[in-house]
Amino acid sequence: IAVYPEHAKRVSVFHNLINWNRIRSKAEQKGGFTDGYTGMRLLTVGRLIREKALELSVQAMKLLKDEGIQARWYVLGEGEARASLRRLIRKLGLEQDFLLLGSTDNPYPYYKQADIYVHASRHEGKSIAIQEAMYLGCPVVLSHCSGNREQNTNGVEGVMCDLSAKSIAEHVKMLIQDESLRKNCSHAAAARIQASEENVEMLLKICDQE
């Protein structure tokens, strides 16, 4: 647009057009957590790679456990960091507290059943996982990076944390202990993403005009 301002009216931007009806339907299917845990469930979805900084989430879970916070953290995804993460989990004695569940064809029941979604990564674009979590009503804890900041207003749909185990733990603890904040963020997160469903209608209108 800066180079060809005369074409500005012909340009529209659409981020991650997603079939929300499909996600809504799949979230209602059988699946999700099977361990019978009744405490607070934390969820992260993504590849097990350095960029996702999951070692900090493991360390954050240790801090939460040491403070007596009742929670269990689940991660959906696979990647090259699995072995190192498992070693760290064993070293910190978190085998029953931080669970690597692997990949699944249908993550949506997990989103729906989770209490808090955590996405504390080193770098992020426009994360589909964050959008899906928010759509299904998860309050979010996100690290301060450009892609995450675009998807969350701090204190509205969730909370923003620094990229450190201490900060992640503090912000997760904040949502766990403040039920009112957690519920308000849940409603706001779903409302924000549901409003974006209009993008599909806009795209169809543009296609009809061509």
Outline where the language-model segments fall:
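Short hydrophobic beta-strand element within catalytic cores of glycosyltransferases
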Residues: 139-142
